[in-house]
Amino acid sequence: DETGIPIILQAGPSCRAHTPIPILGKMFRYLASQTKTNICCHVDHGYTLDECYEGIDSGFTSVMFDGSKLTLKENIKISKKIASRAHKHNISVEGEIGFVGYDNGKISEGTNIEDAVTFANKSNIDAMAISVGNTHLQTSKKASIDFNKINLIEAKTKIPLVLHGS
């Protein structure tokens, strides 16, 4: 409360592996109710429609659907369904286009700019995670972020962009 800085309480896949989404939703909402600070209660990297629906139904204020391993058509289809349900409850939706890799794991594939434009225009999401050289769980001090690609995507879309990792 002292700083007034908004906070995101996030439940990623490793957290959800140990604690069910309904319990996390109640816990996060309780914590948020104990402060005047703006708190976002976020399901991060929901990989299925049902997982995101469960987050919506469990009191989260934001969900992220990670359809980055799906075809563009399937990613749009599922993201649109999630956004339709979420928006009825004033819940924001983040989608991901272009796989973001992991440190010492599968490398980032990079977001295709035209796919990003199509995804932003057709999925009805509120924010879009992109792959531009960023890496989850990065431990090195040097990142190879493609700022030119970020600028090109930003110029062609009217949606807030999100970078995971790095």
Language-model region placement:
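Alpha/beta enzyme core
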Residues: 1-15, 21-40, 46-163
